[in-house]
């Protein structure tokens, strides 16, 4: 339309994490005391962590449904596991979604809780960075159940924190861009509620060796594809295309006028 001749080319460059920044923030002096507080607060409990925007595509509903199924069909985890779910207010709030989440939290706590223990700790708010990194570091499992998502930075931050502290596994939805990035994570279909519950049970029961192997592979992927390597690879590709453009030889447009005159 603009009479510009182009040779378009597309590519896939996986966006990464600022690993050194996360590692630095996760090892600050204030993190240790927060971790100690969490361990004392949930002594003898396995901690599952979730941190999502309160948005339909983030799968918070599916996560809570799967946690209910876990406690229903795997009774060994009743009074032995806690889900700490942070839901960050979205830009456009949804009263209906907020109500659904609150109802599910109340259902789980009503059916499986007691006067001395509440299985779902739900915080609909932003939390301080120290609390956030302490939670990622002390958790026994991270749970990402998005039904559609791009690069989920929380999952990568969890991998970095766990490499420094616990080497605990992560469950991640196959419908996130991060699933391609973290091949060694335990991947699930968030719509398969029973399957997610089974994956949670498996993740809480895996051997120390499997925990170590999965975390090691995930950590290698995270540190090898950082935001810096993403920017570098993109710039290198642009430079390559520019060099190719200036060295290319274009075929001139065929001139029909001399041919027509000879007819």
Regions found by a protein language model. Give the residues of each.
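Short acidic alpha-helix that forms the nucleotide-activated donor recognition element
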Residues: 128-139
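Catalytic binding pocket for nucleotide-activated donors in carbohydrate/polymer assembly enzymes
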Residues: 71-84, 137, 141-224, 229, ...
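Conserved donor-binding/catalytic core segment of Leloir-type glycosyltransferases
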Residues: 42-57, 84
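Nucleotide-sugar donor-binding and catalytic loop/hinge architecture
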Residues: 2-9, 23-48, 75-78
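A conserved mid-protein helix/loop that constitutes part of the nucleotide-sugar donor-binding site
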Residues: 55-69
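Nucleotide-activated donor-binding/catalytic signature segment of Leloir-type glycosyltransferases, i.e.
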Residues: 87-130
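Short hydrophobic/charged patches on amphipathic alpha-helices used for structural packing
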Residues: 36-39, 133, 219
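C-terminal amphipathic helix plus adjacent low-complexity
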Residues: 4-16, 87-89, 116, 207-263
